[in-house]
Amino acid sequence: MKLISCNANRPLSDAIADYLDMRLTRSEVKTFADQEIFVRIDENVRGEDVFVIQSTSYPANDNLMQLLIMMDALRRASARRITAVIPYFGYARQDRKTDGRTPISAKLVANLISTAGADRVLTVDLHAGQIQGFFDIPTDNLFGGPVMVDDIKERYGKEKIIVVSPDVGGVVRARSLAKRLDDADLAIVDKRRPEAGKSEVMNIIGDVRGARCIMLDDMCDSGGTLANAAAALKEHGASSVSAYVTHGVLSGSAVERIEKSVLDELVMTDTIQPSEHALKSKNIRVLPISPLLGEAIRRIANEESVSKLFDR
């Protein structure tokens, strides 16, 4: 087995290698003056089971091309099997047609990954679960929940908490976490616009008065949804509001928005390399995802069950 990393999140690749007590295969990924990407693998990979680690986060197109070109190089170098390890799968929010004459970009990206040479895909918390079906190759979609459950239990102990979905679409994800937290109570933030031209109203489904609320979402991009939901929960009497997300996209001024909000804490994993600004923020904390990914890679390499990782 060999591990190889592109440039999107090298610290995560190093941490996965440490978990597996391996070293990363030597390679070079560089960008020419005209912005073309060049890849070279500096070790023999013939007949090897290779895992390529690369999140397709910002800059999404550059990171996607790095992954595609790296897999093409591995295929031409006669690697026996290529697994694309994509902790954060970019373009996942473009999983369906939202209007006439619009693309389904997530499906296109899935096709590109397969065509470039991937034999299987390993990813974490796809924005929409059906994206697994976009691939015609085996695809393992890991759940970040266990990482969060351990942290929540450590920090809150026996305190009564309520798991909150920041929107109706995330209820299934929130319910799954609540079950892992000894069937914790569940609440939902329901955003509604009463009529055209009127501002959005936050309705809270569930009683959060005096409760410690744990919001769960797959990602935090602009931070607006979580900040607004936290304000609504506090207005309805929540004693504290923390948010747990798998992917800290944190676009634009998201860090400042989180810091200015009433959100007590944003906890995210490192599927995307956190910026220095995020790391220094007193409101943001990062959980390592490398043990989960490393164990999944070990199981795939040894032909063991990946789903048993979540049998608890």
UniProtKB/Swiss-Prot annotation:
InterPro entries: PRib_PP_synth_CS (IPR000842), Pribosyltran_N (IPR029099), PRibTrfase_dom (IPR000836), PRTase-like (IPR029057), Rib-P_diPkinase (IPR005946), Rib-P_diPkinase_bac (IPR037515). Mg(2+) 2 binds at D167. Keywords: ATP-binding, Cytoplasm, Kinase, Magnesium, Metal-binding, Nucleotide biosynthesis, Nucleotide-binding, Transferase. GO terms for molecular function: ATP binding; kinase activity; magnesium ion binding; ribose phosphate diphosphokinase activity. Involved in the biosynthesis of the central metabolite phospho-alpha-D-ribosyl-1-pyrophosphate (PRPP) via the transfer of pyrophosphoryl group from ATP to 1-hydroxyl of ribose-5-phosphate (Rib-5-P). Its cofactor is Mg(2+). Belongs to the ribose-phosphate pyrophosphokinase family. Class I subfamily. It comes from Hyphomonas neptunium (strain ATCC 15444). This is Ribose-phosphate pyrophosphokinase.
